[in-house]
Swiss-Prot record:
Signal peptide: none annotated. This is Sec-independent protein translocase protein TatA. The lineage of its organism: Bacteria, Pseudomonadati, Pseudomonadota, Alphaproteobacteria, Sphingomonadales. One of its GO terms (molecular function) is protein transmembrane transporter activity. GO terms for biological process: protein transport by the Tat complex. Keywords: Cell inner membrane, Cell membrane, Membrane, Protein transport, Translocation, Transmembrane, Transmembrane helix, Transport. The keyword Acetylation does not apply. The chain crosses the membrane at residues 1-21. Gene3D superfamilies: 1.20.5.3310. Its main location: membrane. The keyword Lipoprotein does not apply.
Amino acid sequence: MGSFSIWHWLVVGILVLLLFGKGRFSDMMGDVAKGIKSFKKGMSEDDAPTPAPKQIDAQRAPDLSATPTPTAETENR
């Protein structure tokens, strides 16, 4: 039960031949090859350099930190 016998492999082979047949399998491999070629062609077209991003002159943001102001309590101490 742990390994497959020759009969198991024969049944699997017959099922594969029935499902895919002689012409279907070669057609599928041709379609896969066309897809790979198309993918490679698309990847080679994307190698065009992209323009550098624009440099924006940044201005320093105003300092919004809280500064303590004197109050009546702190003046009396």
